[in-house]
């Protein structure tokens, strides 16, 4: 399964209409969506209604979205993929504790990541990995054209 944001095109007036310049449909209603990776079928979605969407938890809106959309699929051994907006140590540990594997790109400035990861300068083609003691969460970093950071939980 994969979680991402999606845009439903809408030209009318709406208090929570969004503009996403990197999407093919730039103006419309933003939704968080969970889809099946093999079929592309949308399994569930949640409409984002702006800052008043919901009171975000201390772990952030990305954590809340993943938790809400994956709830029916937890404790079944599924694997969820998402991008750096949603990634963080708390959501990875939460999903691992609920028998759900997870993988995604991650920014080096997220809480709980080793400081060495931020400072690590790799030569092209080189890689490194970090793991928290007594944890099934692994952070891998490698350099292609740019440095890429990937976090995965439970699938070690």
Residue ranges and their predicted role:
Residues 1-156:
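Acidic, contiguous segments within the catalytic cores of piggyBac-derived transposases
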């Amino acid at each position: 399964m994969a979680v991402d944001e999606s845009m439903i095109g809408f030209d009318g007036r709406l208090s929570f209409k969004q503009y996403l310049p990197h999407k093919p449909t730039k103006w419309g209603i933003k939704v968080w969506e969970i889809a099946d990776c093999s079929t592309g079928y949308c399994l569930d979605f949640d409409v984002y209604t702006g800052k008043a969407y919901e009171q975000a938890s201390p772990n952030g809106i990305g954590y809340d979205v993943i938790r809400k959309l994956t709830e029916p699929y937890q404790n079944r051994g599924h694997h969820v993929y998402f991008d750096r907006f949603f990634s963080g140590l708390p959501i990875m540990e939460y999903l691992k504790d609920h028998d759900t594997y997870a993988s995604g790109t991650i920014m080096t400035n997220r809480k709980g990541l080793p400081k060495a990861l931020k400072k690590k300068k790799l030569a092209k083609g080189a890689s490194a990995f970090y793991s928290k003691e007594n944890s099934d969460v692994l952070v891998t970093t490698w350099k292609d054209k740019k440095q890429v950071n990937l976090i995965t939980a439970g699938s070690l």
